[in-house]
Amino acid sequence: SHWFPTIDKPNQKTTNEIYITRPTKYVSLSNGTLINTKENGNGTATDYWKMDLPHAPYLIMMAVGDFAIIKDRWRDVPVNYYVEKDYAPYAKEIFGNTPEMMEFFSQKLGFDYPWPQYAQVVVRDYVSGAMENTSATLHGEFIQRNTRERLDETYEDVISHELFHQWFGDLITCESWSNIPLNESFATYGEYLWNEYKYGRTLADYKQYENYRKYLEEAAGKNVDLV
C-alpha cells in the first residue's frame, strides 16, 4: 500500500473511494462496488469505485486492462472473473466453483461472505502468486489454463485459499505484520476444508501433507526461523 498515502498497518482499517480514468477500450476493477462510469468524450472514461466497509490499507487495489468480464453470482452477490480475452471460454472452468465455495465457507463459518461483490482478476508479471485484496482477488497468469492444461493442474487450492482470506485476513485481520502467519495459516486451512468437502478426506490429507513437507523444506532455502 505504498502507492498512495496511508498508515500502512494491518490494524489501521479504513473505507476508500477510487476514481480510475482509463481508455474506453479497457475496463477497471477495485474494491467494493462500481458506483458509476462517466464517459469523458476524449476516448477515456472514469470509473468511481467505493468500498464503504473498513479494511486494511494493504488490501486496497486497482486493476485496468483489456479484460473479458465473465459474470457469475452467489445468492445476491455479483461474482465476476476478469481474464484475458483468449481465456474467456475457459473462465468458468477455472473459477466456476467459486459460488459453491462461497456458500460452503459461509455455512461452515456461520458467517456469510461479508463484502458487496467478489471478483477475481488475472494479471501478468505479478510479483507473487496471488493476493486477497478485499472483494477483488488478484491472480498471476499461471492460473489461466485451457481445458487440456487443467488436466495437469487446476490451481483450485489457490482459489479457495484467497477466498478464505476474505474472512481471515480481510474481515478479521492480524494486529501487526509479524502476525501475518495467522492470516496465512487460516487460509491454508480453508484449502483443506474445501478439498475435504468437495473431493474427500484422502485428497485433503494428502495435500495437507504436501503443505507440511514444503513448510519444513523452507528452512533449507531461507535464513529465517520456522514459525
Predicted regions and their residues:
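Hydrophobic alpha-helical and helix-loop surface patches within well-folded domains
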Residues: W49, N80-V227
